[in-house]
């Protein structure tokens, strides 16, 4: 049984103003109750975690994270339910009907409605994730680990990389590519130890000034690569030099095996050696 959206009035409170009430019909809430349960479980398992969701349910109705979570559940529930609903376009928006004498809305309109709800859902996801990072319980969850596994824990990356489709679907498609790129940069330039540390700090919003600079520059290289550009070796070298010049801010790198790639052993000839040149 759903815990955050429990009746028709609450459901409509969190939906875009497109569904009109049709007199004599079963309430929209009753029609999509199963989808609300499914959407709530999806939000918990994908984004929020059970512990954090229970905390959110205890917040007051005007709490920002509670409002965004409810909007996300409502939009996803309706997006799932629409294919099984009978819809009619009324002067006040779409209505849910079962009267066979009423002509349903066209497939094109319904498809556009589903797309609009997906966009609305994705906007909710984009707004929710930064709020979740302020919840201490959430930071220790499996869900936080998923989003914190790259330098791009939020959906903003989808606005920086070319592509089509919903933001959430594109984020999921980009994620494995980002993981591969970051792994390559870690091994060859930045060290796995440093990236592991700054990813968590980036998620928590606790980066120091110099580490913010590093993350900004590293992300710029990753975004460029995702858009089909080759890595800028000169720029990567500049980033490494920045790390080398600020050892107190990047101890993970200085203690790593990767750092040794940029500090080759110095060979000195003795005066007895042939070819002595100094």
PLM ranges: what are they?
Residues 1-67, 84-278:
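Conserved short "hinge" loops at termini or chain/domain junctions
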């Amino acid at each position: 049984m759903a815990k955050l959206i429990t009746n028709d009035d609450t459901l409509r409170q969190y939906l875009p103003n497109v569904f009109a009430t049709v007199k004599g019909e079963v309430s929209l809430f009753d029609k999509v109750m199963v989808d609300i349960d499914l959407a709530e479980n999806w939000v918990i398992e994908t984004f929020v975690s059970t512990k954090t969701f229970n905390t959110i349910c205890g917040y007051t109705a005007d709490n920002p994270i509670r409002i965004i979570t409810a909007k996300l559940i409502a939009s996803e529930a309706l997006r799932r339910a629409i294919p099984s609903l009978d819809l009619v376009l009324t002067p006040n928006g779409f209505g849910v009907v079962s009267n066979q004498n009423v002509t349903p809305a066209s497939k094109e309109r319904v498809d556009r409605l589903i797309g609009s709800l997906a966009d609305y859902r994705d906007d909710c996801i984009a707004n929710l994730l930064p709020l979740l990072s302020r919840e201490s319980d959430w930071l220790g969850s499996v869900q936080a680990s998923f989003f914190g596994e790259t330098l791009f824990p939020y959906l903003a990356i989808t606005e920086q990389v070319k592509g089509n489709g919903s933001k959430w679907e594109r984020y999921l498609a980009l994620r494995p590519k980002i993981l591969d790129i970051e792994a390559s940069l870690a091994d060859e330039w930045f060290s796995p130890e440093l990236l592991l540390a700054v990813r968590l700090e980036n998620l928590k919003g606790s980066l120091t000034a110099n580490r913010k600079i590093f993350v900004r520059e590293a992300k710029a290289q990753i975004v460029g690569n995702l858009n089909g550009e080759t890595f800028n070796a000169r720029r990567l070298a500049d980033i490494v030099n920045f790390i080398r010049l600020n050892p107190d801010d990047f101890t993970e790198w200085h203690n790593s095996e990767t750092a040794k790639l940029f500090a080759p052993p110095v060979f000195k000839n003795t005066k007895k050696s042939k070819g002595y040149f100094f």
